[in-house]
Amino acid sequence: MRWVLLVAIVAMVGGVAITYRASKKALKAQVPEKPKALPSDLNSNALDWYIQETTKGHPGYHLTAKEYSQVKDSSRLDLSGVRLQLFAKEGDAYDLVTSANATYFTNEHRFFSEGEVQITLNIPMQGEPKHQLVSIQSSGVACNTETNTMDTDQPTSFVFEHGTGHSNGASYDPNSRVLVMKSHVQLDWNPAHPGAKPMKIEAASLIYQETKSEIWLTPWGRLTRGDTVVEGQQDVVRIHEVTEADGKKRTVIHQVEAVKARGSDTYPNRSVQYSADWVLADFDDEGVTRKITGRGSAQLTSTSPTTATEVKAGSVDMEFGARNDESVLERVMATDNAVVTSRPLPAPGRQLSETHVLRSQVVEVRMREGGRDMETVITHAPGTLEFLPNQPAQHHRTLDGNDMVIAYAPQNRIESFHTTGARTRTDPTDEEKKRNQAVSLTASR
């Protein structure tokens, strides 16, 4: 019987050994695979990574990434699937920066993305935006998570509530609310109403001062709306918000100020050109020019099919009406050594009349409906009216007087003339000089 007992013991030991080996094999299969060693230049890597910072109880920034890796012995983090929120100090809004890949230097609070970057400004923390938000696309973007400022030197495109734009390079400071478009700037400002003309803004560089509602164009800028152009140096474009009949609000360009400026309105059968050392142009809510003020070496030329009228003075104020979404010259006030020259233009079947030159300290010109021809010219100070001959039979004449009122018929022909204290001088023609005809002088009260 002893051998039977030995056989049973051996069988039991063998069974235990087999069970142990099977269990060991099963446990070994369940052990997780040993992670791969990190590259020698990395400290760590991870999925779904984030970092955030608060300042005085308010969120400062929140940076998340689908993946990240940290360079060994460095504060540099290489990120992919990146989302950066830069919160306003008031805590009511934030700017959002997204990119496929970026680098963040934690010690420097510096975020940089070499590739394509999408930026959305001033997203409200609660509720829907009151208007379309500013959206920016660029590359090579650097952000500072302490100051929340952004900067790039690469081509940049913008989409905003009233249009689009592009520039080479841009920067934005949410603390001062200043947006800079660095060079080769163009904005296309779309009208709010169907049928109205868009306005194109061009500049060497642009600075948008949001808190002042001003756009600075430096060192030069140009605004074009249909056939209307205003350009100059150190332009300041002022915008303001208007409320529509339905209660909706929109932002419009209402004023442009510039130095060494010039402009033009060119339409079929009429044109206006002007220049001055300093110009202020006012627009209505549809973008139509309504008033232009020129100071210092001010000059205006209004041209119709029959006449070119030139106004020169130290100061010129022009008032415009609006017709069919176009500006129409209605009135000109010239002060400080004003000179108004009306010169007839050649036309088939019509002889040229004299050129009229009016000089006074203050001259007012009122235009006929449609802005092509003069209706009335008034001097609000003593003046001199000179007639320059354009035909051999015409006389050179001068007339001095006070409170002159000159009424014009169509095609800028003098219809009536009134003055007080008149003194005239009429010079003989060349033919009359051959007959020794003398100068004629007259005077009247």
Where are these regions (language model features)?
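Mature-chain termini and adjacent capping regions
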Residues: 1-445
